Amino acid sequence: EEPTALIMRVHRSNFKLVGFTEEPELKDMVAAAHAAGVPVVDDLGSGALYNTEKYGITHEPTVQESMQAGADIICFSGDKLLGGPQAGIIIGKAELIAKIKKHPLARAVRADKTCLAGLSATLLHYLKDEAEREVPIVKMMSLTLEQVRGRAEAWAAELGHGTVVAGESTVGGGSLPDESIPTFLLELEVKSADKFLRALRKNNPPIIARTENDK
């Protein structure tokens, strides 16, 4: 038999498993793997750098928690909950990163300068503790309900059309399945919601909306 090369944990970032289910803690996986001389790879998916519970959302494993648990390699996205450009990030032990860099595919999937510049700018906001002010996804999640209501009411007053109603929003990118946060919406009644939605998206700049019950 071939020896085990590694143990990998893949976080369920875009679906939920419900019912009578159990899974080991990452730290226990690391302890068992390291006792056998096997590295552990932790694929976090969205790669949050902050506690999502702060914004009223179920806890999402963070990069820091994975590091503290002792994972040898950690993979996560540069976009989604982190809020930077679309990218795949790999961090971990220097000797393992060096092996990954030597793989023939590494050159084909490496990030370009534009992506690296955007990612660097995003991470700097976290280092400066200004993500809630400068990183769009974090900024949006940190808004209070009253702030969202105020925006919707101001927009309705400016347009002279529409009704402000309570609703629910989801965190994008498949990051938090079956999770929603309370919000306020500007509801517009139009002849064809689908046609109006397409027109909004083709606008310059595009306006991203959604349809519910032909509104």
Located regions from the model:
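Conserved PLP-enzyme active-site core in the AAT-like
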Residues: E1-H125, L159
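Proline-rich intrinsically disordered, low-complexity coils
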Residues: P3, P24, P39, P104, ...
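Arginine residue identity/basic-tract feature
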Residues: R9-R12, R107-R110, R133, R149-R151, ...
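Serine/threonine-rich low-complexity intrinsically disordered regions
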Residues: E23, N51, K93, P136, ...
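Short secondary-structure junctions and interdomain/linker hinges
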Residues: I73, R107, Y126-E130, G162, ...
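Structural motif of enzymes handling amino- and sulfur-group chemistry
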Residues: E95, H103-P104, A111-L159, G167-E168, ...
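Conserved C-terminal alpha-helix-loop-beta "cap" of PLP-dependent enzymes
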Residues: L145, R149-K215
